[in-house]
Amino acid sequence: MPDPATYRPAPGSIPVEPGVYRFRDPHGRVIYVGKAKSLRSRLTSYFADVANLHPRTRQMVTTAAKVEWTVVNTEVEALQLEYNWIKEFDPRFNVRYRDDKSYPVLAVTLNEEFPRLMVYRGPRRKGVRYFGPYSHAWAIRETLDLLTRVFPARTCSAGVFKRHKQIDRPCLLGYIDKCSAPCIGRVSAEQHRQIVDDFCDFLSGKTDRFARELEQQMNAAAAELDFERAARLRDDLGALKRAMEKQAVVLGDGTDADVVAFADDELEAAVQVFHVRGGRVRGQRGWIVEKSADPGDSGEEQLVEQFLTQFYGEQAELGGAADESVNPVPREVLVPCLPSNADELTSWLSGLRGSRVALRVPRRGDKRALAETVQRNAKEALQQHKLKRAGDFNARSAALQNIQEALGLSEAPLRIECVDISHVQGTDVVGSLVVFEDGLPRKSDYRHFAIREAAGQGRSDDVASIAEVTRRRFARHLSEQNDPNMLSPEGKSRRFAYPPNLYVVDGGAPQVNAASAVLEELGITDVAVIGLAKRLEEVWVPSEPDPVIMPRNSEGLYLLQRVRDEAHRFAITYHRSKRSKRMTASVLDSVPGLGEHRRKALVSHFGSIARLKEATVDQITAVPGIGVATATAVLEALRPDESKAAP
């Protein structure tokens, strides 16, 4: 463990200007990023008596081996640079906002030609608008059921859309007028996008305009004695009003604001945000925050600053639109307290919005009452998280301890990797590698392997495939470990930078012995290897004649099963994808100069390969990007008999 005194810079060498600093570990990875009004004052505080530091700060400075800094002109520049570096390096000791993905949102895929309305859980993506979150998925479906009467936008998946386009017949929603059926050309892409834009405007708070328009249309239809249409418009108006009733008015002055509140303990904090648009709560989001390692960053003022910087910085990147309805930064941000650099933060937020933003603490009235409601939600979220964390942590700790005791390991296997092989009768043979850290899946470290040497031409050898994946995984680890140039200059981890404590293979004695032989061949002796056989859930250890039998109800066996099943799922998914690509390979793939984009354009234009085969050169050249030479080559590929018969 590095001693902070070994890399402490001389106090006189640290500038007193504002700037941003970063700590690196012995491998060069960035582990913490911070900013300061005075670099000298802030950095000196890290090298005080280690015993007096906050436990997380103490762990950070004893993990680090180097500190470096960049001087900037203003605190606003420091704020922006700190945000950029945290986003780029993802330092392990910085505050991390884990978005509560358990709540569903209503997503609108504006980045598609025909945008889709759908229930969504997961990280935010660029080009997609989100409304919510909602307490339950059924609440979103109920809202969609009401609003698609008035805004008949597409809600189907890409597969369903493609299928109905091919058969030239809409789905049930198209027949009952809850979808405008863009799949069969009932509306154009521009008309469908206008429907979606109106839907987004309604959910953004511009509700009165649509209600007035429907009421006018209803009265006009009644005046023309078109009572059937008037009745339908009356029902549509009722659906709109019921949807509006679901969003309570909390601020009567048409306020556009985000209301932020925190609840914290010594290690973590809960953040809750209510998004108020047009005086109505349009959504609620929550995060759980691991507190920073910075000795001055544990107070509420610092939590406010860090949250605003990370949240609105990411929202601006995902949104980036200047229109008021989709601007990621509201006119007003209400917080429990103002940070010391409130003026700089306000200036930065105003720059993101493109107009003035007010950052203030609500003192009285409805805004104060709403802030107290958000605060109660934050306290409840932190309490629920602590209860859940205690249960999860105890179960995972027990599982890791069970595995350690059953296998006689020197320490608990904090990083477990598992490999599995998937194929059908020797075709499309693939391997998967999944990673669990501290008993939880680390999906960013998952890897696929296309088996090269141990399979091919309809043959497959599972044992040899296990050996191949093991060799490729650990050979890469050794090359990164021994070659300093393989380390990312930005301090990011390479794919196989960390070896596992426990390496699990799906199978029995032959598979585990093959993996063990590869590790022995590579000179790796500090990685335990086991095999988990499916039928009896036996745990096989290299060179042992009998398996280890773990209790059927033990947490350790349950964790190993989860790891093995996840590896199997990941391998099956990749195998199916690879097989599907092979089975759907088109004769167009062989046309020289015809790339994937233009192949899709041809099939989309004609609807099928059969129709394309019947087309003429002139009809094919009507597709954007297709010239005469390419059209001729396409027809030669589709009509090989005719091209051979031609003189």
Curated annotation (Swiss-Prot):
One of its GO terms (biological process) is nucleotide-excision repair. Keywords: Cytoplasm, DNA damage, DNA excision, DNA repair, Excision nuclease, SOS response. Residues 16-95 form the GIY-YIG domain. Gene3D superfamilies: 5' to 3' exonuclease, C-terminal subdomain, GIY-YIG endonuclease, UVR domain, UvrC, RNAse H endonuclease domain. The keyword DNA repair applies. Its main location: cytoplasm. SMART domains: GIYc, HhH1. Transmembrane segments: none annotated. GO terms for molecular function: DNA binding; excinuclease ABC activity. Residues 208-243 form the UVR domain. One of its GO terms (cellular component) is cytoplasm. It is found in: Cytoplasm. Interacts with UvrB in an incision complex. The UvrABC repair system catalyzes the recognition and processing of DNA lesions. UvrC both incises the 5' and 3' sides of the lesion. The N-terminal half is responsible for the 3' incision and the C-terminal half is responsible for the 5' incision. HAMAP family: UvrC. PANTHER family: UVRABC SYSTEM PROTEIN C, UVRC/OXIDOREDUCTASE. Belongs to the UvrC family. This is UvrABC system protein C. The lineage of its organism: Bacteria, Bacillati, Actinomycetota, Actinomycetes, Mycobacteriales. The gene is uvrC.
